[in-house]
Amino acid sequence: MKEVTPQQAYDLMTRDPKCIYLDVRSVPEFEAGHAVRAINIPLMHFSPGQGMSPNDDFVRVVEANLPKDSRIVVGCKTGGRSARACDIMSQLGYTDVANVLGGFVGQSDNTGQVVQPGWSMLNLPQCSKCDDDAQYESLAKTTGKLRAAE
């Protein structure tokens, strides 16, 4: 799997305006703040009483909205969910996907020491407002079927 740092992801997006930042965090995580130009298709949904559960529509919504030959950088909170999403997308035939190491928040070791700074830690461009076409609800509707997204 190809991996890039948040800075490398930002540089790719700057050089290639067609490069897509796919944020696979839950809807509330995305709405709290995300990379500029990111779109949100959660790998997992968050439910207050149940925690995280798989998004059964992840593959369907990805395939309906992202051409397989697109250049896509995939991020999450720290890099774990996005690595899984990259694996899934590669199996589906996506040819140019890269996992964003450290994700949006950054990755720390067991002692709390930062081992990979995230997008927000590096002060890369971010926002909490969403364009309608970047939100999961809109992306899921384009497929003609929408499941509840918490």
Ranges and model annotations:
Residues 74-75:
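Short, surface-exposed ligand- or partner-binding patches at beta-edge/loop junctions that are enriched
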Residues 1-19, 27-71, 80-150:
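Rhodanese-like catalytic fold shared by cysteine-dependent sulfurtransferases
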